[in-house]
Amino acid sequence: MARVCQVTGKGPMTGNNVSHANNKTKRRFLPNLQSRRFWVESENRWVRLRVSAKAIRIIDKNGIDAVLADLRARGELA
């Protein structure tokens, strides 16, 4: 399973670990992904999504129905 948010599309970024001596080594910054179930009242069922913490805030603000409609319009959800 890819480390990508299904709502926002956020994925891993690359950067550097920087030591006190300013030595740099490559590293990955992973998104804060959570597997969450959301109750969809209009469909009377649970929907399981792998979402970032920001996506949970977006769902709280706009509602799960609006977010699912956007996902279906983009063709990312059946």
UniProtKB/Swiss-Prot annotation:
Organism: Bordetella petrii (strain ATCC BAA-461 / DSM 12804 / CCUG 43448)
Family matches, as NCBIfam families: L28 (TIGR00009)
HAMAP family registered for this protein in UniProt: Ribosomal_bL28
Signal peptide: none
Gene Ontology terms: biological process: translation
GO molecular function, one term: structural constituent of ribosome
Coiled coil: none
GO cellular component: cytosolic large ribosomal subunit
Annotated protein name in UniProt: Large ribosomal subunit protein bL28
Record-stated family: Belongs to the bacterial ribosomal protein bL28 family.
Regions crossing the membrane: none
Pfam families tied to this protein: Ribosomal_L28
Recorded superkingdom: Bacteria
Keywords for this protein: Ribonucleoprotein, Ribosomal protein
InterPro entries: Ribosomal_bL28 (IPR026569), Ribosomal_bL28/bL31-like_sf (IPR034704), Ribosomal_bL28_bact-type (IPR001383), Ribosomal_bL28_sf (IPR037147)
Ranges where the record places region Disordered: 1-21
